[in-house]
Regions:
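Short, T/G/N/S-enriched strand-turn elements that build extracellular solenoid repeat scaffolds
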Residues: 10-19, 31-38, 53-62, 74-81, ...
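Concave beta-strand-loop units of leucine-rich repeat
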Residues: 2, 23-33, 42-55, 66-76, ...
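Extracellular/surface-exposed low-complexity segments
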Residues: 130, 142-143
Length: 143
């Protein structure tokens, strides 16, 4: 039985000294940085209705055991090495996946952004799925 966390509003802007979350984590507020967080032992998702204007990177995050939903975020993913489930990159400008070795599920992309990604060094257990998303770079889009 996993523990679940949900960060709401703007009370927490960093994970500070926390290195691991043992469970699922949902973020519904604006983050500044990931502090020392390197592993999430469950799903990690960002709310689809909050634009992460201050979060420039998820560094030092290396592993998400479950699904990782980064829809409507634009943070650098250069430290990310493994996602155990699906990786949702729809409506993002998260193009630097240079450390990503493995995705245990599907990768979801906005069709208009797909040419910006290189998955040649990534083992993908599922498939790459494309979506016809309305997309405005560095802005929250509803559809």
């Amino acid at each position: 039985n996993k523990n679940n966390g949900f960060l709401q509003e703007n009370f927490i802007r960093t994970f500070g000294q926390i290195t691991r979350i043992n469970g699922n984590l949902g973020i519904d507020g604006k983050m500044n940085n990931f502090g020392q967080l390197s592993v999430v032992d469950g799903d990690l998702w960002f709310s689809n209705h909050v634009y992460q204007e201050y979060l420039e990177s998820v560094y030092p995050l290396k592993k998400v055991v479950g699904n990782l939903n980064l829809k409507n975020t634009h943070a650098c993913l250069s430290s990310l090495e493994e996602v155990g489930g699906n990786l949702n990159l729809r409506k993002t400008t998260c193009y630097d996946l240079s450390s990503l070795v493995k995705v245990g599920g599907n990768i979801l992309l906005s069709k208009s952004q797909s040419h910006n990604y290189d998955f040649s060094k990534t083992e993908i257990a599922g498939t790459i799925k494309m979506f016809n998303d309305e997309f405005s770079q560095r802005k929250l889009t509803s559809r």
